[in-house]
Amino acid sequence: MAKKAQRITLYKKIWGNIRKYQYLHDLSDEELAKILELTTRTLYTYDKDPSGLTLKRVQSFIDCSGMELDVLTSA
């Protein structure tokens, strides 16, 4: 019996792309936390489970980064 493939949720895609942007633009965790208006501890929580990521946080990131939502949600 084949093992079911684990799905990547939209939360994980968005969070992964935010972390990718952070890496490519050489932002510290503190700088990213300031952009998203949260604490660095919450960043680490989102690394484990990004389902707590809100639209307000995503919108804050889009406003600061200039990234389009469709790019943020792409794989």
PLM region spans:
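DNA major-groove recognition helix of helix-turn-helix/homeodomain DNA-binding modules
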Residues: 56-71
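Alpha-helical residues within the helix-turn-helix
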Residues: 23, 34, 63
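Residues in the recognition helix of alpha-helical DNA-binding motifs
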Residues: 21, 35, 46, 75
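Short alpha-helical "recognition helix" segments of helix-turn-helix
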Residues: 29-33
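A short, Lys/Arg-rich alpha-helix, primarily the initiator
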Residues: 1-25
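Key DNA-contacting residues within the recognition helix of helix-turn-helix
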Residues: 15, 44-45, 73
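Recognition helix of helix-turn-helix/homeodomain-like DNA-binding domains
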Residues: 37-53
